[in-house]
């Protein structure tokens, strides 16, 4: 459980990641996006209305999300996250990150400090790339969550 969820927008878009697509029953569903190398906050969808219509046609339950179709990746994802949280009764505060020259783990530590965090929740793979000493020096405990032990239900199945 978290007190605050911070949506990262001031970081690099991850090609072939989950920021603009999802996998359901071994099939990928994608919101097409411009291919420029820009931060997430500057990424634009090519055809957001058309792509969202295709997804909601395949998964009518997603109509419950009451999503505001947005041209920017960060705004659209924020709309989906906030709507899903409301439907699921999740009342955790949702914030955006902020511009900083820091990168990688130093950025995460700075965000945690900004929110007076005592703990940082990470996926288990964070062990492979985070500099845990930076968290230790800031007196922030890192809690690794093994995704394999979490529910495998997708948002579509939960709705």
State what each model feature region is.
Residues 1-159:
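Residues lining hydrophobic/aromatic ligand-binding pockets adjacent to catalytic sites
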């Amino acid at each position: 459980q978290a007190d605050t969820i911070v949506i990262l927008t001031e970081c690099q878009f991850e090609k072939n990641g989950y920021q603009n697509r999802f996998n359901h029953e071994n099939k990928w569903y994608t919101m097409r996006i411009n291919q420029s190398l820009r931060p997430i906050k500057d990424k634009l969808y090519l055809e957001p209305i058309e792509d969202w219509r295709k997804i909601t046609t395949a998964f009518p339950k997603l109509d419950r999300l009451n999503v505001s179709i947005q041209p920017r990746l960060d705004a659209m994802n924020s709309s989906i996250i906030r709507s899903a949280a409301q439907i699921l009764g999740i009342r955790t505060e949702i914030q955006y990150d902020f511009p900083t020259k820091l990168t990688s783990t130093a950025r995460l530590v700075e965000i945690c400090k900004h929110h007076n965090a005592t703990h940082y929740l990470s996926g288990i793979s964070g062990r492979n790339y985070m500099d845990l000493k930076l968290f230790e020096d800031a007196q922030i405990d890192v809690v690794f969550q093994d995704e394999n032990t979490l529910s495998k239900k997708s948002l579509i199945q939960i709705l």
